[in-house]
Swiss-Prot record:
It comes from Thermosynechococcus vestitus (strain NIES-2133 / IAM M-273 / BP-1). Transmembrane segments: none annotated. GO terms for molecular function: cobalt ion binding; phycocyanobilin:ferredoxin oxidoreductase activity. GO terms for biological process: phytochromobilin biosynthetic process. The keyword tRNA-binding does not apply. InterPro entries: Ferredoxin-dep_bilin_Rdtase, Ferredoxin_bilin_OxRdtase. This is Phycocyanobilin:ferredoxin oxidoreductase. PANTHER family: PHYTOCHROMOBILIN:FERREDOXIN OXIDOREDUCTASE, CHLOROPLASTIC. Catalyzes the four-electron reduction of biliverdin IX-alpha (2-electron reduction at both the A and D rings); the reaction proceeds via an isolatable 2-electron intermediate, 181,182-dihydrobiliverdin. It catalyses: (2R,3Z)-phycocyanobilin + 4 oxidized [2Fe-2S]-[ferredoxin] = biliverdin IXalpha + 4 reduced [2Fe-2S]-[ferredoxin] + 4 H(+). Its EC number is 1.3.7.5. The keyword Oxidoreductase applies.
Length: 236
């Protein structure tokens, strides 16, 4: 049984939605993670910590990563990032849900540019979406300059806002899958590689994620997981 069956209902629904959209657009092939990092169990302050990774590849993406994690009965996490092949100047799709004790405390989604600004087709499509208002927006972390103006970071209030957020992720993801299939190779792959490296290096600064992993598995393991599973930088 997948870990998601035990997680917050919104995380279950989002995981299913992401995989359904991927399957609708791409011929998914497995992406090989280190054998010991695909499914991981540990202890965090006496509670069981479980991490389950789902990883695929499909042109023009070198890696499609969906991570589910659970700490005891108190914390549920969904983390998703799509890593384009560096020869395409495509944004980084990323979303995260963090919940515990029946509530979602943090929800974020973005299409983050890697070469300064989003491609014009993305800006046009995202501007065409109906504007949404959420009652509790959250402040981006200090390294949040990597995100686009279309980033949504909130604490959803009630089921209606949870559904709105889920649907908006579906819209962002569908747009991304559609537009990515029209991408042509860039003349400046080194700029894309540099942008993806910057994105990954900034995300690796996420202290909350790092602290949880270090407490459960130790500093060397956490560093390896952060840099090989969560945010591996593309080769030069």
């Amino acid at each position: 049984m997948s870990l998601r069956q035990h997680q917050h209902p919104l995380i279950q629904r989002l995981a299913d939605r992401i995989e359904a959209i991927w399957q609708a657009f791409f011929p998914l092939a497995p992406y090989a993670l280190p054998e010991d990092l695909g499914y991981v169990e540990g202890k965090l302050e006496g509670e069981r910590l479980t991490i389950e990774n789902h990883c695929y590849q499909a042109p023009p993406f070198r890696k499609l990563h969906l991570e589910l994690a659970r700490v005891g009965e108190s914390l549920d996490i969904l983390h998703c990032v799509m890593f384009p092949e560096p020869r395409y100047d495509l944004p980084m799709f990323g979303c995260d849900l963090v919940g515990g004790r029946g509530q979602i405390s943090a929800a974020i989604v973005d299409l983050s540019p890697v070469t300064g600004q989003l491609p014009a087709a993305y800006t046009c499509a995202l501007n065409a979406l109906p504007k949404l208002t959420f009652r509790q927006p959250r402040e981006l972390p200090p390294w949040g300059h990597i995100f686009s103006p279309f980033c949504i970071f909130i604490r959803p209030q009630g089921e209606a806002e949870e559904q709105q957020f889920l649907d908006r992720i579906g819209e962002y993801l569908t747009l991304h899958c559609q537009l990515s299939q029209q991408a042509v190779p860039t003349d400046h792959p080194q700029a894309v590689i540099a942008g993806q490296r910057q994105y990954c290096q900034q995300q690796q600064q996420n202290d909350k994620t790092r602290r949880v992993l270090e407490k459960a598995f130790g500093v060397p393991w956490a560093e390896r997981y952060m840099t090989t599973v969560l945010f591996d930088v593309p080769p030069v």
